[in-house]
Amino acid sequence: MSVSTTLSTSTSLDLGPARALSCRECGHEIPLAPEFACPECFGPLEVAYDFVGVTRERIEAGPKSIWRYASLLPVPSDVTRHPNTEPGLTRLVRADRLGKEIGLKNLWLKDDTGNPTHSFKDRVVAVALAAARELGFSVLACPSTGNLANAVAAAAARAGWRSVVLIPKSLELAKIQMTAVYGGTLIAVDGNYDDVNRLATELAAEEEDWAFVNVNVRPYYAEGSKTLGFEVAEQLGWRLPEQIVVPVASGSQLTKVDKAFRELGTLGLVEPTPYKVFGAQATGCSPVSTAFAEGTDVVRPVRPDTIARSLAIGNPADGPYVLDTVRRTGGAVTDVSDAEVVDAIRLLARTEGIFAETAGGVTLACTRKLIESGQLDPDADTVLLITGDGLKTLDAVAGHVGPTATVSTSTAEVRRALQG
């Protein structure tokens, strides 16, 4: 689907190693352009590459951000010269206390709470902004369940662009405030995320200067999630984990982490050892988990009802590709209740000092379920993606945590509280 015939095409673009857009269904290729649907079969497009001269040494000598992987991304060769939020290279935490608690001997947490707006969405938005600039757009826009709204508003402010963000009006107050503070235009829509996404798709076809990061520049945007896979492999000493658990909203993150692992193996940057990919959903929005359990390839849309609003996408665009990925690698997709999500948030905070938003709670709670079912190997090297900060979803733990005691200004009362 074309957004505008006036925007740049591949004959004049510098998008690094990217050479074309390829249909994930029929394989048809088109030149690089602001397109997201195949003109032949209407399947989704993704970026195809010709990689040249990518080495570990070149990567390790690069910036301490996702731009160290610029030679593996659809971004201009001079990407670091333009203002951006420079996310990435977040910490990979060895989680022995949590691992002992849940029964995993070799557990790591990829902690993306340390990104500029405290979620992994800074990665995908940084790549989308770099591509959008090269494609000739001038406004950065998105429909969002919250984290993407924060990232788009911040990246646009940093770049000096206008932002237009559409959100469901039921979004957590913290995420609304964390978007509005950057300026730009923030519009709350009376509907759920899927309603907001449909509205954004209509606007993307009408507003030729607007880069809707997860609509008309989605093929480029989605590639930003590969940097999670690249970083995990590099931080493990240039090797792949044996198991990785990824939260599933649209499903793009999971499929792109898998793509990253495969690219690293093909390029000889890591030994292409086997790995299993697992997906995590909340029961109140679990269309992919349901399809996996039923053994079908059909992901039926649902109406979300969960505290994990950042995962509340009832009609996930990459749902079928998530199923393909987990089945190909020997993984699985499962789901957990909201109560289990809250328990997992508290467990992670108590054992490792990381306060995750609800998506992280979903990931950890699903990990426990996968261990109990025997689907996760307790002895294998395992990575969990913690994709956002709990400060964004304080309402999830409200009523579950608070002061141990309330006392007067008396040391005796403090001591009684300590003993109680």
Where are these regions (language model features)?
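PLP-dependent amino-acid enzyme catalytic core
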Residues: 2-420
